[in-house]
From Swiss-Prot:
This is Putative E3 ubiquitin-protein ligase LIN-1. Expressed in roots and nodules, and at very low levels in calli and seedling shoots. Pathway: Protein modification; protein ubiquitination. It comes from Lotus japonicus. InterPro entries: ARM-like (IPR011989), ARM-type_fold (IPR016024), ARM_LIN (IPR055566), ARM_LIN_2nd (IPR056514), E3_ubiquitin-ligase_LIN (IPR052858), LIN_N (IPR056512), RING-Ubox_PUB (IPR045210), Ubox_domain (IPR003613).
């Protein structure tokens, strides 16, 4: 399907495909800064190589220098733009970069500048211009420049600039060319094979690309191959250019218009049509085509006859190409050929392990151009730098004795042919006879005398008789034996004699410096290249390590490998060739004290850097690669040497094998369990005595023996036997991976080991670890409690046997894999299992050991991330020095884990505890922790930068912030830059979380409760109280008050420091970043950003003003108002209100508020019942001179309820979401007023006449009626119930009551007071009372004559509170009294256009008046407004705080008298009763 799209996709599909592919490629490059830097260095290496190959005396012209400088400046400016988050600066740098890069992009590709092809510079410029247009979000131009890059220089674009993109866009079209090349290559190689009828060789198609065949070619054959390679590369380039132009035309052609013809799809034609369809899979490096190494510059033409030798010499020190290929090509990512169903090919591919296939050909081969063509050279030296269990390579193993070094071409040809036949037979045979072990009659001497021919003795493990052997295991255990010492420094390497002789590397009096050991100063005899890239003599570096050193002598980088890698054979061959041409210098600089062959001894090669129990590196689970590498190096085929001190003699091997046979027979055939158990003990003893001899291990690795040992594990109950069986299996697995595969092939084997582990056999953890189970297997058996037990308990030592890995280390490695696998729920569940098994204290204690320390930190980190509550447990027990030591000595990955661990650890619920840990981190260690963190921050990947920045900032703020601190500046800059990463929302979210945790409000469960704390400040304390109740943060039974006071002071001080540093960094740049985050479409991010912004603005006004307040207001005010208007979340609205409250204290904010006053005022009215802050803002808005308060008023009639059948609505009262109305016929109705339209829930008729008055106090309702009774009611959610009836013998016209007494008005003058038990008392002041109001022990009576009497209820005395101006005409009366917030509102007849007055009860004076020409009969007051009802059916509305009239409501019934008036508590609804028996409901929006 990879190529079918050529015929299926129309132009729109192609444009969509290009957009997706190129955009993804460019996006990946922009994300990966390290890759861009490495790519620039590699291109610079090619430029430097070209410069070095030219004439040293040639002077580069100034114009050429300027062009190269423009390219460099353009790339630099582009990189600065990528790293800049200020948009103005970014755009300016992008403009500058475009100008610089366009200079090189427009160069004539057919010319050169300073020896560099213009096409190379132009393609490089187009690549960077593609980056540039992607940053400008112009996809069209981005794709155009990317395609232009392939048009200008398809070759170098394919190998240097964009190999991944070439693979996606062009490779699917090249299948016919690749097929042609493969067929031609096949034809040439068949001429090389001595016996072309050897079908076993042709069975493996990849062998035709093996350079061992190239090295055996004759000159005329090599010339043909070179021309083929050249023609193949040219075909790929031409067709790449052809398709790039086609893609470009598709992008520029408008499919919806007929103005431009639709481009025609090109066809990639090979130079010659293949005769047959290709049915084989092709290695990736073949599809990729010829490659020119960076160090070769741009020299596609031949330089000398010995270019191949130069190329080989280059490979000793260069590993860039392999790294590139590994990152681009998969192990078997092939073109889908015409015949996709070829079963032979599939079986053959499946029989070879993918990792080993990758190691043989794909990453390890180059195609080097020389004399106009290419040949491939193996990068075996690179494998030595990164050891791995590679498949046997013909370039590494065949060796000849010194007496066979004669440069006789016939002999060489013969030897190569024999070797090829032997190799083909190894590949052909599915099973190999184990004659070595069953009949140990072959000796080293016999092999030496067999015509000095190279023989391959197989030591291959079977799984079962019907199973096909895996090729990687077969090759991994091959032993190559020859007839003499294997010291490579003796006499050359035979296979290289087919190549031209090496030219002299040095014309001086000294050998090349690459041939000399920097420690001994002598020419290498046995060179080993360490992981740092430095090469040393094996004995010298072993002595260096034996003295206790753990770092590279030159680079001082720590060495993680536990044993030395293999010999650098490529360098060794170069040295041998140089010695032949410079015998005198070789003799002078050779180490005469080093015996010949001594460095080849396995006792020298395989000495581990750690003890036997420390064979693994920092952790036994070091990604399993170190373990495999260690096993591969320890059991290398070094037993072929004849040195008597290196391995057991052959006679000893035969003796041990003969001794093993009866016990093996018992183990595999006997049904007597004790006999089998005894056999196991004997086998273990003999295995130990063999001193890890590979032949003995091979003999014991048969599937039948493995199955016998597993049966013992299943059947035996003897712990010693079980542990010994595990020891044997562990040793065998350590030697041979096929043993592990044999065990893994049967699920019950793993189940058996899991059962043993659960039953308390600690050693079972070691075997489980060596089997490398997947997460699903571990999870299914629930091994965590058992693993914790292994770590906790002291393991029993095997008497005479030493395990390859400590079971505790293995258990920790398995525990780490279990905790890091699965989804978030699984990780949380597994972490809880570790905590519940009491594993935390043991793991913390285990940190004291160096082995497994990284895994322990990783496990503890997983526990803290999954279960935040365990942080305190870890913090109280941990010693931080081991973690800091691990950070200082570890690689980037380990450092990242340590930083994440420390960052999580300081997120405790007490600030004092956090500060103590921070002090420990700061003061521990021999190095400056803060400086180390700073250095790591500057090179750490993005996922770790936030953690180290947070940690570094907290360490810096332990002391009072100084005026300037590089640590603080770098940390804050990192956090703020992360907030600008709008294309990476995860990074923004992590930055917000880090900043919220920096504030310090953290619960005992490890969560930030800054939001709840801010809501509490705003008056909405329900979330905070609920959190405190659940978390019990406010309850510290064992803490002293002084301690909690210290904690409070520490937290307040910390908040001020954090707020000061964040707000004042670069003049409030964080507020600009938060402004962008608040615009995010992610609700979670916007919420976190709002919390942080609210906290910062709240703290900002507690700090001295440094000019940042204005920046914060300009950045956040509009966003906060937008949240207030548009958000549907109550908490968000309250947070926005709190932030707005801090801004309104600044007078400059008032003008901005005027624009939004009307829209936010309504929202604030709804919020005032939840937040007192809303009330404060409303007051500010109402007091703004520029705001017309009448514009803020809005109301709407909701419903009119017709109750005329019950007569007039004489009284109403609002209580707990219910409205109660009293009617003329004695009915009391209870309404559910929680919704906009009230609903009757109860109707009572216990009064026989009109209910004239209703009032409430507490949970009691009091009703007065003309039937001469006062009734007391209980109020419930479903209605009212009468509990007392008082017959007072006279009609009640007005009533005010509470639980102590009742005051009522009857027909006479004065007022009567009834204490519920005695007879009513009359307080007569010779005036008719029209209204009553009670406040404490004072009763206020609105009387005729426009006066107010005050009655002292404790003494039953009265006095005049207010006497109004009387008029000669008409009666003036106080019709209604209301007490609200210590103010007495008195309304009645209009006198001098004033119908109401407001009195301060504390000052007993008039503080305001209500101006209207109408008499007011009823009054209602809520928190915002005063409502006054008149007898003509209108309601006048005033602002309660300013006594300013804002509106007038006209009743629908015309001039109907308003008889009752009431508003709800929230001030959102108004209920009006009238004389026509109707109730109108108004919504006050």
């Amino acid at each position: 399907m990879a190529r079918n799209f050529r015929f299926m996709m129309d132009q729109k599909d192609i444009v969509r495909f290009l957009t997706t592919t190129v955009d993804s490629f460019i996006q990946d490059r922009l994300i990966n800064k390290e890759q861009r830097t490495q790519h620039k260095e590699q291109c610079a290496e090619r430029l430097a190589a070209e410069d070095g190959s030219g004439d040293k005396d040639t002077e580069v012209e100034y114009s050429d220098q300027a062009v190269l400088a423009n390219l460099d400046w353009g790339i630099e400016a582009l990189e600065e733009a990528i790293n800049t988050y200020n948009m103005e600066t970014k755009l300016a740098r992008l403009d500058y970069a475009e100008k610089m890069l366009q200079v090189c992009a427009m160069l004539n590709p057919k010319q050169k500048i300073a020896g560099v092809p213009n096409s190379y510079l132009s393609a490089w410029a187009h690549l960077n211009l593609s980056y540039l247009w992607k940053l400008r979000n112009n996809v069209q131009n981005c794709i155009s420049h990317a395609l232009e890059m392939f048009i200008v220089d398809p070759f170098f674009t394919r190998i240097d600039f964009a190999p991944e993109l070439w693979k996606s866009l062009f490779l699917p079209h090249m299948s016919s060319i690749v097929g042609w090349y493969s067929e031609e290559r096949h034809r040439l190689m068949m001429e090389v094979i001595p016996d072309s009828a050897d079908l076993s060789f042709t069975a493996d198609f990849e062998q035709f690309f093996n350079e061992s065949l190239v090295l055996t070619m004759r000159p005329h054959q090599l010339e043909k191959l070179q021309k083929l390679e050249q023609l193949y590369g040219e075909s790929l380039d031409e067709n790449t250019k052809l398709y790039a132009k086609y893609y470009n035309d598709c992008m520029n052609s408008d499919s919806s218009s007929s103005k431009k013809a639709v481009p025609m799809l090109p066809i990639a034609e090979p130079p010659m049509t293949p005769l047959h369809e290709l049915s084989r899979t092709i290695p990736d490096f073949v599809k990729f085509g010829p490659i020119l190494p960076k160090s070769a510059g741009f020299s596609l033409a031949p330089r000398s006859k010995d270019v191949l030798n130069e190329t080989i010499r280059e490979n000793v020190t260069s590993s860039n190409l392999k790294e590139e290929k590994l990152s681009i090509w998969g192990a078997k990512d092939t073109i889908i050929e015409e015949n996709e169903d070829d079963s032979d090919s599939e079986l053959e591919n499946e029989s070879v392990d993918s990792d080993d296939k990758n190691n043989i050909f794909s990453p390890g081969m180059k195609m080097m151009k020389y004399e106009g063509v290419e040949t491939k050279v193996d990068l075996s030296c690179q494998r030595n730098q990164i050891p791995s269990p590679d498949i046997f390579s013909p370039l590494d193993s065949p060796r000849t004795a010194p007496n066979n070094s004669s440069p006789n071409p016939d002999m060489h040809s013969k030897r190569d042919s024999k070797f090829l036949r032997l190799s083909s037979s190894r590949i052909r045979e599915p099973t190999i006879s184990d004659s070595l072990t069953s009949s140990p009659d072959i000796s080293i001497d016999n092999i030496s005398n067999a015509d000095n021919e190279v023989m391959v003795l197989k030591n291959i493990q079977r799984k079962n008789d019907n199973q096909t052997l895996s090729m990687n295991h077969e090759n991994e255990n091959s032993l190559i034996l020859n007839g003499s010492s294997l010291c490579e420094s003796d006499d050359g390497y035979q296979s290289f004699n087919s190549l031209p002789k090496l030219e002299k590397l040095s014309m001086g009096s000294k050998p090349p410096k690459d041939f000399v050991c920097p420690i001994t100063g002598q020419i290498f005899c046995d060179p080993v290249t360490l992981e740092t890239g430095q090469t040393y003599e094996r004995k010298a570096i072993q002595e260096w390590l034996r003295t206790g050193n753990t770092t590279c002598p030159i680079t001082r980088q720590p060495l993680s490998a536990s044993i030395l890698p293999k010999t650098n054979y490529v360098l060794k061959r170069l040295i041998t060739s140089w010695k032949e041409q410079n015998p005198e210098l070789a003799q002078e600089f050779s180490n005469v004290n080093t015996p010949r062959g001594s460095s080849c001894s396995p006792s020298a090669k395989d000495i581990p850097m750690l003890s036997t129990r420390q064979r693994t590196t920092d952790s036994p689970n070091h990604k399993n690669k170190d373990y495999a590498r260690q096993r591969s190096n320890r059991f290398m085929p070094a037993a072929i040497t004849t040195s008597p001190t290196s391995v057991l003699s052959q006679a000893a091997v035969e003796t041990i094998v003969n001794s093993l046979k009866p016990y093996i027979s018992s183990l595999c055939t006997s049904e007597n369990l004790p006999e089998c158990e005894e056999a196991v003990l004997k086998i273990a003893r003999l295995l130990k005595d063999s001193k890890t001899n590979p032949q003995i291990h091979s003999y014991l690795s048969k599937p039948t023996i493995i199955n016998g040992l597993v049966e013992i594990l299943s059947a035996s109950r003897n712990r010693e036997v079980l542990r010994t069986s595990i020891y044997i299996l562990s040793e065998l697995i350590f030697t041979d991976d096929s043993v592990a595969e044999t065990l893994n092939s049967v699920d019950s084997d793993f189940d058996c080991l899991a059962t043993l582990l659960k039953n308390g056999l600690a050693e079972a953890a070691l075997l489980i670890y060596q089997l490398r189970p997947v997460f699903a297997q571990l999870s299914a058996h629930e091994l965590i409690p058992s693993l914790v037990d292994v770590i906790q308990n002291k393991n029993e030592e095997l008497d005479d046997f030493q395990l390859v890995i400590d079971p505790k280390d293995a258990a920790i490695a398995i525990l780490e894999q279990t905790l890091m696998g699965g989804d978030e729920y699984s990780r949380s569940l597994n972490a809880s299992s570790v905590i519940s098994a009491n594993g935390i204290p043991t793991l913390v204690k285990y940190l004291e050991r160096m082995e497994g320390r990284r895994s322990v930190v990783s496990v503890l980190l997983c526990c803290m991330q999954a279960e935040k509550s365990c942080k305190n447990l870890i913090a109280n027990r941990i010693e931080l020095s081991p973690v800091l030591e691990l950070f200082h000595s570890g690689n980037d990955s380990v450092r990242g884990t340590c930083v994440e661990f420390l960052s999580e650890l300081v997120q405790l619920n007490r600030r004092t505890s956090c500060n103590q840990i921070l002090h420990t981190i700061k003061d521990e260690g021999a190095f400056s922790t803060m400086h180390t963190f700073l250095v790591y921050l500057q090179m750490a990947p993005m996922e770790h930068q936030l953690a180290v920045a947070s940690l570094l900032l907290q360490l810096d703020l332990l002391a009072e912030p100084r005026k300037m601190s590089i640590y603080r500046e770098e940390a804050v800059e990192t956090l703020i830059e992360a907030l600008w990463q709008k294309d990476f929302s995860n990074t923004q979210m992590k930055a917000l979380d880090a900043l919220l945790f920096l504030i310090g409000h953290i619960s005992s469960s490890g969560k930030s409760y800054t939001e709840a704390w801010l809501l509490k400040i705003a008056g909405f304390d329900q979330p905070y109280n609920a959190l405190m109740k659940v978390e019990q943060l406010g309850q510290h039974d064992n803490d002293l008050i002084e301690t909690m006071e210290d904690e409070k002071n520490a937290l307040n001080s910390w908040q001020k420091r954090i707020a000061s540093v964040l707000c004042n960094h670069e003049n409030g740049s964080i507020f600009k970043a938060l402004e962008e985050c608040l615009k995010s479409n992610s609700l979670k991010m916007a919420k976190s950003c709002l919390v942080l912004a609210t906290w910062l603005t709240h703290m900002l006004y507690t700090l001295p003003d440094t000019g940042v307040r204005d920046v914060a207001r300009k950045s956040l005010l509009e966003e906060v108002i937008n949240v207030l208007q548009s958000s549907k979340n109550l908490e968000e609205k309250i947070l926005a209100t709190l932030a707005l409250k801090t801004f309104i204290s600044d007078p400059s904010t008032h003008e901005a508020l005027r624009v939004y006053a009307k829209s936010i005022y309504r929202t604030l009215r709804r919020l005032k019942k939840y937040s007192v802050v809303a009330v404060d803002i409303m007051k500010v808005i109402l007091n703004l001179k520029s705001v017309d308060v009448t514009e803020l008023w809005s109301c709407k009639e909701v419903v009119e309820l017709d109750l005329s059948s019950n007569g007039e609505v004489l009284s109403m009262v609002y209580l707990n979401g219910q409205v109660l109305s009293g009617h003329t016929d004695g009915t009391i109705k209870v309404w559910d007023a929680r919704k906009r339209i009230p609903r009757v829930i109860q109707e009572t008729h216990e009064h026989t006449k009109a209910v004239t008055s209703l009032c409430s106090s507490g949970d009691r309702l009091y009703s007065g009626s003309l039937d001469k009774t006062i009734r007391v009611w209980t109020i419930k959610s479903d209605g009212i119930k009468c509990i007392d009836v008082y017959d007072i013998k006279e009609a009640v016209h007005e009533l005010a009551a509470n639980d102590k007494l009742a005051c009522y008005v009857s027909q006479g003058t004065g007022v009567k007071v009834f204490n519920w038990s005695e007879a009513p008392k009359l307080i007569n002041f010779s005036k008719y009372v029209k209204s009553l109001a009670v406040a404490g022990d004072k009763l206020y009576c609105g009387c005729s004559g426009y006066s107010i009497q005050e009655v002292d209820l404790s003494t039953y005395t009265s006095n005049s509170f207010f006497t109004g101006t009387r008029k000669l005409l008409g009666k003036q009366t106080i019709h209604s009294l209301q007490i609200h917030d210590d103010y007495l509102f008195a309304c009645g007849s209009s006198v001098d256009a004033t119908a109401g007055k407001i009195f301060s009860l504390s000052q007993k004076m008039v503080v305001g008046s209500l101006s209207t020409g109408l008499d007011i009969h009823r009054i209602a007051i809520n928190s915002d407004f005063i409502f006054a009802g008149t007898k003509f059916g209108t309601i006048e509305v005033w602002l309660k705080d300013k006594f300013t009239r804002v509106a007038s409501i006209k009743m629908a019934g015309g001039h109907t008298k308003i008889t009752s008036l009431v508003s709800d508590v929230d001030g959102m609804m108004l209920f009006v009763g009238s004389s026509d028996g109707k109730i109108q409901v108004w919504a006050l929006d």
